[in-house]
Amino acid sequence: MECHYSEAQLASLLLPYLERFDENAINGLASELKSHGISVYAAAGFDPNVGSSLTFKKEVPPSDTSILEDVDHVNLYSEQDNFHLSMLDMMDFHTPDIMDIGLFTDVQHEGDPVDELELSSDTRSSLSPSSHNTTTGHETGLSSVTPPQSYWTSDNLVSTRALPTTGDKQLSPQRRTEIADISSLPTCQQISLEPQCHSVMEAPCHGKEVTKRNKRSRTEAQEASNSPCASSTADSQTNPAPLRLRSVFGPGTKYNLSHKSLHEISDISENCIRPDLVEFLEERLTRWKKTGFWHQDQIPEPTASGAGREKLIDAYSCICRLESRMKDDQILNRVAVVMLHTAYEQACQEWRHAGTHQRKGRGRGDATTVIDEILSELHEDWDVGDRKRYHRSRFHDKKRFGKRWLVLIKSLGVGILLCSSQRLASAVYVLPFQITLFILDTNLSESAATRRFLPATCCRRWFAVSNSLRLNSC
């Protein structure tokens, strides 16, 4: 029995199976078609305006040299033969949704998909180019190559378009019943169907191995992330916090911060600013007004001027009293460890300049010797057991924490000691200290008005990111 059909009819018959079934089902379909005297050549092509496409051609004798036509440029025959209709009924033909396909689940919004088909030397052949497209193809029986962006059904052309995403969930593609001009679509709405991984398949008719993999350059990935579609989807998500900030800091105000900046400020405040900041300040300011910041009746205020040695002793003594009497006062502890670090730096410079102490051994310089003398004066159990090692380690830990808080103060202002959340404060006391501050410049970030409200409202855009930079020396 001889069958007459067009390339468009073959495309409408085969493309849905390329999208719906896995490799074994595709090979079985090819074998079934071959039993009816049908063999198909499949060629993959790429056009910057259209994307990936498939071209089908009936297997003909060597004397027939007809040129392949791209499936997107073929006129559909209105009259279809009985064989084609019977094949549709036999195989339960339907048009599946792209998101329901199990074979191609890696769907990305890319305008210029780069799907490279690498062939073995036995399967490589030259094909005639189609209109507006240079086709570099190969001859196989049927293999699950990248499907095109549109395919023919028994009635008309169905185009699969990607809809904008909402969050991490992508909506189902829209099925259109008119001929779609893919080149006129925005770049972010052209869909690219890429295989999930590198795979090697065997062509069912010729037994050839086809190596299929996709490559994507770094430049294209950056262009996709910087596309207007990506920014529009992010801005489309409604966040109530920027809505509250917009009237004060948004566009049109004296600060004139963009919507993106307002979103960042909202996210940062949720993670790095304590949620009870207003209530905390109201309660503490009342107490500090009555008793003083350092509670002078219990803890003497550390010396802010004078020699480094005296300042170091005062700061360390203050820390010891805070831990023994007021362990819950975290604000005072943060200030004290910062003063301990600054006093230690000043004392080290003075000791190096004086050079009064001689090095006693490897790794033990002036600073180590002086610290041991100070700790022995402050702790009565200095010479008991391993208490000497304990006090040394404790002193250097406090000094290290002070240096870390000082890093935050230099970037964010001294107000961070008051408004820091427990999550950010806990990162300071983690060993090793893994934190990086990304401070994104804005037009008003260095203005006096911005610096004035920076500690309380975080209107200078910043964020603490762990596992980015290890400050082991802190």
Swiss-Prot record:
Q: Does the keyword Nucleus apply?
A: yes
Give a GO cellular-component term.
nucleus
Biased composition, Polar residues: where in the chain?
132-153, 222-240
- Could you tell me which residues belong to the region Disordered? 114-153, 207-242
Keyword terms, alphabetized: Nucleus, Transcription, Transcription regulation
| Superkingdom of the source species | Eukaryota
Q: Low complexity bias located where?
A: 120-131
Sequence ranges of Basic and acidic residues compositional bias: 207-221
Task: State the compartments where it is located.
Answer: Nucleus
The protein's job, in short, is: Transcription factor; part of the fragmented gene cluster that mediates the biosynthesis of fusarochromene, a tryptophan-derived metabolite closely related to a group of mycotoxins including fusarochromanone.
Protein family according to the UniProt entry: Belongs to the POU transcription factor family. Class-3 subfamily.
Quote the protein name from its UniProt record. Answer: Transcription factor fscB
Q: Which organism is it from?
A: Fusarium equiseti (Fusarium scirpi)
Ranked from the top, the taxonomy reads: Eukaryota, Fungi, Dikarya, Ascomycota, Pezizomycotina
Encoding gene, per UniProt annotation: fscB
